[in-house]
A protein has these predicted regions:
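All-alpha prenyltransferase/terpene-synthase fold signal
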Residues: 1-277
């Protein structure tokens, strides 16, 4: 069996090939952002497809990362963020017009790669892109905390859904059904913790500015929970994390899901520890 590090290196090579097609100066500025990052979605996809076709899985993982990269470029423009993954954001480095068109091109490249997995894989990623756009429109129109999960399901869970779909296509449709729900719930926990880190995280550790949700008058659930108490956040984290572990418990990925869920809880715990000092 090919190890994850080798497959991730293959994913990175595909990303660099796409980045290089932009030429200078875009390739240099974009490469500084594309060459790092946690690769959460790619890692999950590769893990779920470990018994499948590795070539297809690498294509799918690269497609997901390219689409995610495009959304980050757009997000940074909307948020007015100067920093992403410890590097200047693309619109800061080269201006808004270049950043906008580069993100659009990344979406096209992502869809081409996903379609090369299977046509169904291409459709899954296209659906994720539409859901992302719809949720960002909802957020830009001033979604309240009551619509928080609608926004999250669109802008974050959609890409985890696509990761599962591309993994399943790479594995010949053999993934257990409960894992799909586990992945979706993980996506919700992932975004909740990310929003919590925006409130109380550290820029040096995250590689991006914090406090952007408040600066942009976005209404997030972690902010509302923190107004109640840190214990309210802890209770929410338990509600979000418990089903993930239970749904995956009967599969061979039980330990993997338990581990990645615990890492998110640990990250949230560090924020809460600082908030209550």
């Amino acid at each position: 069996m090919v190890d994850e590090a080798s497959l991730l290196a293959d994913v990175d090579r595909q990303l660099h090939v796409v980045v290089a097609t932009f030429g200078e100066p875009v390739a240099d500025a974009l490469g500084a952002i594309a060459g790092s990052g946690s690769r959460h979605r790619a890692r999950l996809l590769l893990e779920l497809a470990r018994h499948g076709d590795h070539t297809l899985a690498v294509r799918g993982a690269a497609a997901v990362e390219l689409l995610h990269l495009g959304t980050l470029v757009h997000d940074d423009i909307v948020d007015g963020s100067p920093l992403r993954r410890h590097a200047p954001t693309l619109h800061v480095a080269l201006g808004v017009p270049v950043a906008l068109w580069t993100a659009d091109a990344l979406y096209a490249e992502a869809l081409h790669l996903a379609d090369a997995v299977t046509p169904a894989g291409g459709l899954a990623l296209g659906d994720a892109l539409r859901r992302i756009a719809d949720s960002q429109i909802l957020e830009a129109l001033g979604a309240t905390t009551a619509r928080y999960w609608d926004v999250v399901d669109g802008k974050t869970v959609s890409l985890f859904d696509a990761s599962f779909a591309l993994a399943d296509e790479s594995a010949g449709g053999a993934l257990p059904a409960p894992l799909r729900d586990a992945v979706r719930r993980y996506g919700r926990l992932f975004q909740y913790v990310d929003d919590l880190q925006d409130i109380g995280g550290e820029t040096d550790a995250l590689g991006k500015p914090t406090g952007q949700d408040a600066d942009n008058q976005l209404h997030t659930l972690p902010a509302a929970d923190l107004v109640v108490s840190a214990d309210a956040v802890r209770e929410r984290l338990r509600e979000l994390s418990g089903p993930i572990v239970r749904l995956a418990s009967s599969t061979e990925w039980a330990d993997h899901f338990a581990g990645m869920t615990q890492r998110l809880l640990d990250a949230a715990g560090r924020v809460l520890d600082r908030a209550t000092v």
